[in-house]
């Protein structure tokens, strides 16, 4: 299992996505007297003297679910057809998750607060984006292995 490069790619995607559950912020909307920080635990309002948490968006459930789905894909290495199908599903779900975060980055400031605000990217956003190529490369590696095994079966 560890000899295959897609195992390493899937493991790196799990690490990148799972590390966002440590509370790293994805992005922040900053105004003159207030800032809104968006992480996997929700949206936190940071005022000058106090902070309050809005847990209306539980992103951590989808992050943990996607990490578990990536792990299941990693562990189904004996059945390449199923692993390829699951890897494609993981890549699609990961792409949807990234696209939703990009849309919220551009439209979220207007939803949360009125007036002028500045956007700041956090380390969690970079890790979220960094895991997507690993997921895609794992899918390509699984496809290459399946093609190699199918050609060997054809020669028998």
Name the predicted role of every residue range:
Residues 1-14, 81-88:
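Alpha-helical transmembrane segments and their helix-start/interface "positive-inside/aromatic belt" motifs
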Residues 3, 14-61:
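Interfacial loop at the N-terminal end of multi-pass membrane proteins
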Residues 2-11, 24, 34, 45, ...:
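Extended, charge-rich alpha-helical interface modules
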Residues 71-94, 152-156:
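Cytoplasmic juxtamembrane regions at transmembrane-helix boundaries
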Residues 21-28, 71-78, 102-109, 136-142:
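Transmembrane helix-loop junctions and nearby membrane-interface residues
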Residues 98-156:
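Alpha-helical transmembrane segments of multi-pass integral membrane proteins
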Residues 57-73:
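Hydrophobic alpha-helical transmembrane segments
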Residues 10-25, 89-98:
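Hydrophobic alpha-helical membrane-insertion segments
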């Amino acid at each position: 299992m560890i000899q295959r490069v897609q195992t390493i790619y899937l493991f790196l995607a799990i690490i990148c996505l799972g590390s966002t559950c440590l509370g790293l912020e994805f992005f922040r909307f900053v105004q003159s007297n207030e800032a809104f920080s968006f992480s996997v635990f929700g949206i936190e309002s940071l005022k000058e003297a106090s902070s309050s948490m809005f847990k209306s968006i539980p992103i951590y459930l989808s992050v943990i679910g996607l990490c578990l789905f990536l792990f299941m894909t990693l562990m189904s290495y004996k059945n390449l057809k199923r692993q390829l199908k699951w890897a494609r599903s993981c890549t699609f779900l990961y792409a949807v998750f990234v696209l939703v975060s990009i849309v919220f980055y551009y439209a979220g400031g207007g939803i949360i607060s009125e007036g002028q605000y500045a956007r700041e990217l956090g380390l969690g956003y970079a890790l979220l984006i960094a895991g997507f190529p690993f997921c895609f490369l794992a899918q390509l590696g699984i496809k290459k292995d399946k093609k190699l095994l199918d050609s060997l079966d054809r020669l028998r």
